[in-house]
Amino acid sequence: MSGYTSDQLVAHSTSDGQLVPATQRARITSIQAGGAASSSIKLYNGTGTGAGNVLIATYIFGTEGLEVYVPGSGILFEQGVYLDLTATPGVTITFT
């Protein structure tokens, strides 16, 4: 029997929160977000937006939405992924 296996995982959220647990290392390989006027997403290494959590990536977009496919090994998050979103109806990430 032949088949295809992948170590890719998917997480989706419609509000601020933990996408990948803080106890888990992750490499984001793609990001998609629904479009709305003046949308933004911020991705933090850690458990929130406060002290001790590092802002890794910020994306600002409008009604066109967002599709990012990260080449190579992806964007590394050593202590989980926390999502801070504004205006967008939802965000989906794929990660290993």
Q: PLM ranges: what are they?
A:
Residues 1-96:
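Surface-exposed, low-hydrophobicity beta-strand/loop segments enriched in small/polar/acidic residues
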